[in-house]
Amino acid sequence: MRKSRLSKIIQYKLIEHFVSGSTARCAADLVGVNKNTAAYYFHRLRELIYRAVEDATPFAGEVEVDESYFYLTGYKGGRRKGKRGRGAAGKVPVFGILKRGGQVYTKVIPDAKASTLMPIMQERIVPDSIVYSDALPSYNVLDVSDFHHHRINHSRLFARGKNHINGIENFWNQAKRHMRKFNGVPKEHFPLFLKECEWRFNNPSPQVQLKQLKHWVKKHLI
C-alpha cells in the first residue's frame, strides 16, 4: 500500500475524527485540509480496516444469523422494508453472523438463497454450535446440518428467553444509523463502509479503535 503524503500529525488528527464518527467534510474543516483529501484518507482507513477484519476466526457456541438490506446512493437507513431476497429491488443484501456476547461478521451477498448462505455459515460457524435464525425458508437447510438450529417466528414470537435474534438486529440498527450520516454510499465502496461498522461494533472502545488505527497507519501509511 502506497504511503500517504500527509504529515504524521495531520494523519493522526484525521484518525481521531474518523474514530469519533465525523464525516470527511467535517474533519477537513477542523483539521484544515481539503475535503477531498480528508475523504480519500478516510477511504484508505476503511481499506486498512477491511484487510484486518477479514482475518476473523469462526464463531462457536450460541450464534445468531440474519440478513438485512441496505440502500446505497440515496440511502435513508431504517429497518427492512418491502420484499426480502430476490424481490428486494434497489437494496443490497447483507448476511450477518453474531456470536452472542461476542463479535459480528458481515458479508455482502448476491441473494439470500440457501445455496448462498450455507457455505458462509459452514465457513464462519464451528460445527455443533447453536444457531438462531428467523423463519426465512433459506434457513431450513440448517435443520439437516451440523448445527443445532432454533427458528424464531416473528409473527408469533419475537423474544422469549434465548429464542431471539436481537443481537444481530441491534447491529443492523447501529450500522444503518452510522451510514445515514453520509447521505448515500457508493455501491463500489459499500463493502468498506460495512466492514467499518463491523469493526466499530466489535471494538466499541474509542481508545481501542484509535490504538488499532494508529498501529495500522504507522505500518502501512507513514
What are these regions (language model features)?
Residues 1-222:
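Residue-level recognition of single "structural anchor" positions
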